[in-house]
């Protein structure tokens, strides 16, 4: 609260705010007095009951005054001064309310408190007569799970009930009576219940009368509306009926359902069981009689009306009797809703009527102007207008066809005045004197009783025999009661047919929901819902029936009601247009008018000049706060007046039928009025320093401004839009846009006016003014409107309107002058109309002026002063800016009037404005022809070069202007550059050159910034740049360039050429999106080319250079092929992968390898999926040429020569069973020539062979069978030759490594500068990061950190050490982890080609040695790259000396000597390519490599595994004995889970368990070094286990160690131990072989072979 006090109250002191003045109701002359005993606290809100009141102060405290019988102490029952409600101390109360004898308050945390009389449960406490202190009311939503406490926003209290509005905009009720809106017969209701009928709707406010309730509800958005059903959901009867009589047709929407509410589908189940009382029959008879009345002849009118009168009287008597009996159940209630298209039918009937409009000039007052149909349209129609209209048309057509044309003459001869009948039927009796509360004079004492009125009306009805002009009906606002039997009309079918053909222009001027504004400001799209007792018509439904549930008062739809007040037995509704509708009891003139009936809302006649902005309703009087000329609110009183001495008023004149202005201007500025039973109260502010006066001025002028805008909209804009032949489509669209923007602005002003009224009721902090906090809403709306109206002006809209609108304007000239505030009678109509349309812009000056006034009320240093000052400047600045926009539009319009007509049509655009042209500023084209005419016109969006009848338009966004230097010979020259043109303009003088250059530069700058319609908020003038940027974003369509003809480019430009990111689209569907450089595609981009033949498109994503594909990219062909790899000059060049077809297609295949000029050349792998073959070898001109290897899925292996895609020349062929042919080939798998065929058993044939392998081979040669005594060493000599005819490992994938060297800036391996290589790496990383930033794939935090760390180049100064070696190792790990780094890209590619080669068909055991050689080649070539980047790195096999001795020494496992680095031949770290790179490379290549090892060792592994399974069946003791382990090494006891257990003969898998577990880890490691460490750790675990059992130090010998290690290997059960052994052997560093780890590895290898030879006895 401190901040609130510090704000605007500092300017004038809080003691001058919220002063309380109180009057006695009806006492004249008025004697206002200060509230007795009240101190100086500022009161924000007051509420009055019958004999008590409640005050809410600024600091959230609540005081009670008056008679308080519920208080416990006898002294406090009637205190002399207001007393503080101590129970609420500590709570910050935000609102209070009072009923007749109880009170309520709501705290800022949404808790409602009630106290006072509780006889009807109105305080939500059970079985308690009084609630002496404020008691919190527990309100919980039972539908929510778990139960949630409902937070309350507002309370309203009646005599016996209370309503609470929750923060979720739902109504909760408790107390007694039908006014609760709950379906229950058990009263009182002491537990708050939700009013389900309004659940799901947004309720804005609730109000309570004595026994009725009102709710202000926001209209449903149009998308939520459901179509109107044809039939009632309850009784399935038609909602609209048509009755065909002899000479007329009756259309009726008089259908009604029980309970007086229209039940929706969702409520049908809940309420279907409600019983109907016998009185429903009476009402049905009334309806029947009423229909008969409408169709009666003149002679029978009186008889029928008397019958109706009798029915009404009997009905009233019945309901009065029910009230006397005190029954709580309402036996009969009716809801007869208006059909949504009532007004549409009215429209038809208005056109049929030939009668003139009869204006009611009673009391000499000006009649309410007839409002157009659409202004009165109901906002929440349950169906779209088109649907409703079509439904109506179909109904009309059916009517017309039902009766003959001859009926028309009978009908048109005469009919009954529908209006008069409805007037008489609407008059309903007052409530009885008992219920009328304090009314001294009962209904029986009134001279003009209801019965008398019925008789008078029936007599008038007898005289009337003319067709009522339906427009007259509309003139009387609200005379039709839409909730009674409504649309009962007699319609001539002939005229209906005629009317059905009439087409009117549909104009919607109600703005749609505007999101932000609707969230910040009060909504004007509201409905009024009422329920409870209606004996005095206080529900507004046109009858005196009670309603158990809320029912919408349809005739208030579209009236923009913003506030409701409920008196004892009457109701008031305040609209945004400062009008008040009133209905209900008018016994004392409390409605502010004397019109009948009072059962429907009618306009109160308070002040003809001033609008109402606040209202209050007492028991039998009303109060109206009105705007006056000096902005000080005036207070009008209407209602009961206590006769003073000497007054001889008749009994029925105890009230004021006309509101009386109370003279209370001396009090100050009234901010709020509150009414009770016998007294009313006003909260008054003193005008210190003019602050309050300025606030009232702002609010008053805003409300008046809204009324004026509403009048313009309804009386000028809508009629104009409905005119025919308004000109071209563009003009009509522009006018409709003007109307739409005007309507939006008008609605915003209405909302703001309503919010200012609420603002004046509150704390009145300047900083919370919407016009300050959300100024952009207003600034944008005014700017949008100004844009649309100036566009309309430029296109000559007002001139085009002149002809079709002349009649309308002439008839309404006086109205036009009045609205536009033009006093000169000689002003032309079009000028007046122009002035009228620009009228709203003037309001901005008013905002600025009032905000400046408010600012002067504060200290200059205060934030309020600064904010008000800034906002004032903003509004003033916008007003001036929009004024300039208007002048620009008028200047442009004048230019178009003089411009040649043919070119005008193509150049004239709504948003185009003229800046300058060369006819008045001499400018010529350099080197122009002698007789040529060149006219240059500068618009805000283009420079136009006109020549005779032709012209060319240069958009400013892609135009560059620069002055020519004097050296170039152009003293007065301007160089103009556009994407496809470059020309020089010569001005007559240097001054002209400067003017043109400045004009063009500013225009280009404005076009680029899009500021043509944006106001320079917050500054005095627009800050123009000296020159527009050379680099900019723009869109352009090429028209000359052959390559780009008709293509459209949208993106970045630099000096007339595309440069930067952009999108280029060709008319034939081609599109490039990516980077440009100097007008050409350059950098990363995406290219699409449609393939019309295949109805697909080619798609390329990758790098470009100088307009051509160059670098890495992916090309997806329309045929389904995909190429990923390198490009050069739009051709595949370098390393790449081509996928052809899919597995399901006719010829799926895959090639990965080198390309040269779009053809396969060099080494590559081709996988023919259809034939199940894989070729790994050399290519030339797209064919296999040179050495290569082929493997098939059937196990065939060929290596040798290829020529033109065929096996031709020497080669070696192996089959799955190890049959080998080595010799000459002539075709694929075709032997031809000399060779040797070797059988699996070693027998071989030498000679000449011919034929295809697998289909019979002719042999001419010698068969050899080797001697039994020949050595086994010579048998596999052919296997040792494998690989000799394959491509050497170092020749494979050269293109991949060459690409990496190229990325580092080297022409060949090692040929380049190191610093340049590092620069290229940094550029590659930065570029890749930028591309990834724009791509949908977002890098993770760790990836981003890795990239950032890679941008730092490792610096090494001084001697090379282990630490520096470790830095390089860490850098390589990071670099190889990210494909954005050249090394990472290399590794990723190598992994891809390796897998491609050795997976699938390539998983052939014959390829193992090739695979191993390939890895070793990778290591050698990558190591070369690393040594180039880190020149200080020693050569392969060099030793790095240790900088310090190892901190802990251990004994050598093998020798027992103390050794720090027994693996190395000398102390230090040995540098090897495998040691540095295998940890990076091998984990990625491990799966395919290990698979080859497993395939190659398959037979050995099977024998080994069989032995392992067999030997592992034995218990530990038996196995140790069998393997020959010395007894001293047998564990005697074992520690299991900390418990020592003896080793039994049956114990299994327990001995040396830790060593076994350790050795099993060998399968989880990748590199030989890691596997060797596991082996070493296993030996150490064995040693630890033996030491624990021997309790003494010892030295292993191999005889002791081998059996124990053999036991561990067996128990470890490693499935592919042979593969592990061979992998280590092939890839381990040679220097390790003779060290400790080498010996341990040899031991493991020996165990592997030993296990295969073990036999178990």
From Swiss-Prot:
* Listed Basic and acidic residues bias regions: 445-455
Q: What's a Gene Ontology MF term here?
A: small GTPase binding
SMART domains referenced in this protein's UniProt entry, alphabetically? MORN (SM00698)
Gene Ontology biological process: behavioral fear response; endosomal transport; endosome organization; locomotory behavior; lysosomal transport; neuromuscular junction development; neuron projection morphogenesis; positive regulation of GTPase activity
Question: What stretches of residues are MORN repeats?
Answer: 1049-1071, 1072-1094, 1100-1122, 1123-1145, 1151-1173, 1175-1197, 1198-1220, 1221-1244
Which part of the chain is the VPS9 domain? 1513-1657
- Name a GO CC annotation attached to this entry: dendritic spine
Gene3D superfamilies under this entry?
Dbl homology (DH) domain, Histone H3 K4-specific methyltransferase SET7/9 N-terminal domain, Pleckstrin-homology domain (PH domain)/Phosphotyrosine-binding domain (PTB), Regulator of chromosome condensation 1/beta-lactamase-inhibitor protein II, VPS9 domain
- Map out region (Disordered) in residue numbers: 432-480
Function (record text): May act as a GTPase regulator. Controls survival and growth of spinal motoneurons.
Assembly and interactions?
Forms a heteromeric complex with ALS2CL. Interacts with ALS2CL.
Q: What is this protein called?
A: Alsin
